[in-house]
Structure formats: structure tokens, C-alpha cells
């Protein structure tokens, strides 16, 4: 799950996303990494 943490610090957009939405966030993880 460290990858998720990295996204938060790496992408400001991720910061806007709701933290509770971890499941959805993981799915969007692909979009952020592109």
C-alpha cells in the first residue's frame, strides 16, 4: 500500500481525492501513474 501513499505526496490532485475512498483511489492509481 506504500504506492498509494506515494501518489498522495506525489500528485496534488490525489490530495483532493477523498482519503476514505481507498478502493476507488487504487483503481484511479493507474490514471495518476499513466
Curated annotation (Swiss-Prot):
Protein name per the record: Uncharacterized protein HI_0967
Source taxon at top rank: Bacteria
Amino acid at each position: 500500500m506504500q504506492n498509494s501513499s506515494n501518489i498522495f505526496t506525489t500528485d496534488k490532485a490525489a490530495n483532493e481525492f477523498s482519503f476514505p475512498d481507498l478502493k476507488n483511489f487504487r483503481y484511479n492509481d493507474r490514471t495518476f501513474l499513466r
